Swiss-Prot record:
GO molecular function: DNA-binding transcription factor activity; RNA polymerase II cis-regulatory region sequence-specific DNA binding; zinc ion binding
Location in chain, cross-link Glycyl lysine isopeptide (Lys-Gly) (interchain with G-Cter in SUMO2): 6, 88, 115, 132, 291, 308, 356, 402, 421, 424
Residue numbers spanned by region Disordered: 298-338, 575-596, 775-794
The keyword Phosphoprotein belongs to this UniProt entry's keyword annotation: yes
Protein name, entry field: Zinc finger protein 148
InterPro entries linked: C2H2-ZF_domain, Znf_C2H2_sf, Znf_C2H2_type
Native organism: Bos taurus (Bovine)
Alphabetically ordered keywords of this record: Acetylation, DNA-binding, Isopeptide bond, Metal-binding, Nucleus, Phosphoprotein, Repeat, Repressor, Transcription, Transcription regulation, Ubl conjugation, Zinc, Zinc-finger
Family: Belongs to the krueppel C2H2-type zinc-finger protein family.
Localisation per UniProt entry: Nucleus
PTM sites of type Phosphothreonine: 194
Amino acid sequence: MNIDDKLEGLFLKCGGIDEMQSSRAMVVMGGVSGQSTVSGELQESVLQDRSMPHQEILAADEVLQESEMRQQDMISHDELMVHEETVKNDEEQMETHERLPQGLQYALNVPISVKQEITFTDVSEQLMRDKKQIREPVDLQKKKKRKQRSPAKILTINEDGSLGLKTPKSHVCEHCNAAFRTNYHLQRHVFIHTGEKPFQCSQCDMRFIQKYLLQRHEKIHTGEKPFRCDECGMRFIQKYHMERHKRTHSGEKPYQCEYCLQYFSRTDRVLKHKRMCHENHDKKLNRCAIKGGLLTSEEDSGFSTSPKDNSLPKKKRQKTEKKSSGMDKESSLDKSDLKKDKNDYLPLYSSSTKVKDEYMVAEYAVEMPHSSVGGSHLEDASGEIHPPKLVLKKINSKRSLKQPLEQNQTISPLSTYEESKVSKYAFELVDKQALLDSEGNADIDQVDNLQEGPSKPVHSSTNYDDAMQFLKKKRYLQAASNNSREYALNVGTIASQPSVTQAAVASVIDESTTASILDSQALNVEIKSNHDKNVIPDEVLQTLLDHYSHKANGQHEISFSVADTEVTSSISINSSEVPEVTQSENVGSSSQASSSDKANMLQEYSKFLQQALDRTSQNDAYLNSPSLNFVTDNQTLPNQPAFSSIDKQVYATMPINSFRSGMNSPLRTTPDKSHFGLIVGDSQHSFPFSGDETNHASATSTQDFLDQVTSQKKAEAQPVHQAYQMSSFEQPFRAPYHGSRAGIATQFSTANGQVNLRGPGTSAEFPEFPLVNVNDNRAGMTSSPDATTGQTFG
């Protein structure tokens, strides 16, 4: 077999004759057609001279593989992608086969002028393609059937000229418009909306949307953990958990915060970091930006920012305000002064809901300033007076706190407070000697005007039931009186200080409650109790507490009269700590009174003392009748009258439990704000107790006074029900009654130490006799009628 037969048989396998003829015309790919034209005689002569053994044809396969490797290096990846996606139909393949140089094997060793890149490469490609073309007809039909569906990815050209892959998603969810490539993925997604979970665990009845989720869950029950850490040997159900765990050993932190560029090893920690640090921080920045804009606008307009609108801490804000300007410094000082004043006067105006035994008046010393009420009269009266001082003692859960209150130059700082605040402790400060010198002067009206401001009624109080507990339970007082128990409301305990007025109102009250004087226009005074006195038995107190514990809070509208009501507020005059003071002081303003009026008042007051002495000696006869019980704190008290007040409409009283002594509070109020009004007589005006004037014309001795009292006692037909009016008690009459505790007379020393006073049957017949103050020297008491301004004991 010659070489021609071998070559002819080889090319017949690779392609048809028409293909070989067409391929001969396209031998040259480089476009040089003139050089590629070779005569057939020359080719045939060359092929005859040289024979091509079969081994050379087999070696062409190795050349083909090497050429393909070089060709892949020369062709870029993008060109290969374009070639794979775009050249896929039969027509393009047929055209490619037609362009391939089929007849190039005849000119392998012929020195013709062709470009170098197409000599052996094209021959190798042709040989390889000829081998693949043998099995192409059957495989090509199968591939056509598989590719009839839409491709997973489509090669596209972006706007910038780059190549991109587009995935067609023709299956759209009806619920959320999500698109999927296949219907299987769509149906699996729809389970999320419908809540259907077709895959159920056989052991714990948990259900899952996908099967692989169920298989992963079942590993929990079986304990299978196929993934193991190489370093520590820990095993995991999921591969993701193992990979996440390995980052703890390697220290790898692939996740970065986009705000602070901090790295984390887990995604959940990145999310937590963003939520905790950056989201809240952004909100704060927005708030600060808004407030900063407001601050800038306020600074431009000349206003300062309030502390609540500033995001800086309080200390830094104060430093900034101090460094800003002098105006800011002044404003900060004003704010601090206001805050201090508010804290100082807070005990005086505590609300009605905080009346529960909070502030007790420990000591109250009054020193009148030069610019006090009365103008030049007060200035001329004394040159040693100073601004008044008030020391309040706070008693709250075994803690004591003293808060000094520095009074300003006015008569009372209490008048500057708001009308809506409750006047729990309102002390009006009046210098007695100054008022004595300025008695009858029109300037005294200024005091009344100033005192009307802070006085406000105490509305619903939690201590009202405590204040009224003895009112409706008369048998408790009677039982205590028969057992020689003492109930006293002391007015006195005046220390000797030059130009200083000190008064005290001590109330026998329960330790857990506040002394409440519940008038409709009253002021409340809390008095410290004296724990040395044994007043009421514990069983009586427990019974009272049990009885009144069910009452609702609130103020009760109850009117009282002397005829059917027993007065439990007892007033006595305590002079145990009263030294001799030669200068008599007058506390309580009174209008001009003539000598005849004073004489009448003296006569009526003498009758009143006679009745008091008579009831002292015959105390047991009046205990069983509705009467006014006035109890002295000791059987050795001096001969000083004890008074109580009953308002015409509203009864004001104090719960009596323990005696609180040593309490000094000068009190002076207006007639419409009365606490203790002693209603004895037919007068419609309030007659305050006041010290008599400096000049005393009467020189009556003590024996004459006692004789007069005895004669009046005999002439009295009904001493118990007789109404008396208070009259001026001159200095000589008071002289026997202002001794020390050692020299106490025995007029008030009875079996049970009580003085019972009973007024007329109807309360309308009783005017007010308010008790204003007690002189330091206990020289006596004088009251003058005042038709316009009656003073009460507040």
